[in-house]
Amino acid sequence: TLLSKVPFYPQQEYFCGPTTLSEVAAYYGVDHSADSIAGLTFTPGLQGSPQIEMAAASRQLGFVAYEQRGSLSQLLQLIDEKIPVIVLQNNGLSWLPQWHYAVVIGYDLDRREIILHSGLTAEYRLPLATFEQTWQRANYWLLAMLPPERTSALLDPFLYTRACQDLLQTRQT
């Protein structure tokens, strides 16, 4: 399963957050460059984008920012529903983290791989076991950016309702 219509943009250094937001927004027909989004998310002192800023930027772009601690099963089911998902990974060690955002765009269960737009690589294939380790070290965080008219039965109703309320409070709809 592959969401081939999710565009890939090579990321600039430390811009994995804005780049993933730009890719998913473009998938839904909303074009914003990573540079323009970086003004909403990027924290120079951290050399990156905190999760709270990722969700806030999603709302500023007009999307429901559905965040949760996910599971591999849920992630694959969201892909089956043609919903690309932003994940946070720790590609370093627990005591020396290397945080990185990527967009999950597919999977191949026969080859036991997850497919990501990540960094400078489009359709990067990563063994599921490796992905689960890096995602686990980031507490299985996921962000599904959804247009306000889109939902999924896979999403926790309470968290989804809260995400919709957060969007309404930004007055972006």
Which ranges hold each PLM region?
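Short, solvent-exposed, low-complexity loop/linker segments
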Residues: 31, 35-39, 43-47, 51-81
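Noncatalytic regulatory segments and standalone regulatory/sensor domains
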Residues: 108-173
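Extracytoplasmic/secreted envelope proteins and their assembly/folding machinery
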Residues: 13, 17-25, 34, 38, ...
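Active-site-adjacent structural segments surrounding the nucleophilic cysteine of cysteine proteases
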Residues: 1-48, 91-92, 110, 156-165
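Active-site-adjacent substructure of cysteine-protease-like catalytic cores
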Residues: 64, 68-117
